[in-house]
Amino acid sequence: MAVQQKIRIKLKSYDHSLVDKWAVKIIDVVKQTDAIIFGPIPLPTKSHVYTVNRSPHVDKKSREQFSFSSHKRLIEIMNPTGKTIDMLMKLELPSGVDVEIKS
């Protein structure tokens, strides 16, 4: 039985529409090379909340909360070819999307 190669691409951003848009673009590029694709798989959204004092030295009871969420998607590519990898390397992702690639 042959060992299957796979590439896992994790996209992470604070804007969910940006992550979804680029996940679709990556899938379209990979479909042109006849590789098998699983995804985009939505991973859990992490919400971060920061609480700060409104005043620099008085009124400890007066606070303000700031929150933001980080959205993640996973794309798995099975049996990638050299052409698949070349096309993925040519993609120019925006600065708002963090990409992590594992093989």
UniProtKB/Swiss-Prot annotation:
A cellular component term, taken from the record's GO annotations: ribonucleoprotein complex
Protein's GO biological process: translation
GO molecular function per UniProt: structural constituent of ribosome; tRNA binding
UniProt entry keywords in alphabetical sequence: Ribonucleoprotein, Ribosomal protein
SMART domains: Ribosomal_S10
InterPro entries: Ribosomal_uS10 (IPR001848), Ribosomal_uS10_CS (IPR018268), Ribosomal_uS10_dom (IPR027486), Ribosomal_uS10_dom_sf (IPR036838)
Function: Involved in the binding of tRNA to the ribosomes.
The family this protein is said to belong to: Belongs to the universal ribosomal protein uS10 family.
HAMAP family: Ribosomal_uS10
Record's subunit section: Part of the 30S ribosomal subunit.
Name the UniProt record assigns to this protein: Small ribosomal subunit protein uS10
Species: Prosthecochloris aestuarii (strain DSM 271 / SK 413)
Encoding gene, per UniProt annotation: rpsJ
